[in-house]
Amino acid sequence: MCGIAGYSFSLESTVDRTVAARALLAGIAERGADSVGFAYRGDDSKVTVHKQRTGASEFLDRIDVPQTATQLLVHVRDHTKGHPRVRAINHPIRHGAVVGIHNGTIANDDELFAAHGIARAEPGMTVDSELIFALAERFRGRTAYALERL
């Protein structure tokens, strides 16, 4: 399975964003060796995503989060569906304007993509987690409805 962590700080917080991100990653590192990634939202509301096909220890010193970041997601992955050599499959996953991380398995994701007429965000995407974010994108503003589709 995977490891997930995150934070949400006000702009006024003096917590060092990079130190916090590295501490979170170190805390979940043993949960996934196939890939690692993080996403943060800056004060301009733009979401920046970084990910790579390595374990957390090879990535730890590369994390650099600006002090203006208010939210962060960190993910380490042991793949179950979708091989980490396809960069888009590694988390965080972006589908349209939605960025997220997930720990678990969705057995019927291919059927649900087809049933809702939703295309994968990128060629070669096969990871089941993308379905959650695709439904959230499709049914924006109707979260309960989107989750019921799962």
Describe the predicted segments one by one.
Residues 1-150:
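Conserved short alpha-helical segments that host acidic/polar catalytic motifs at enzyme active sites
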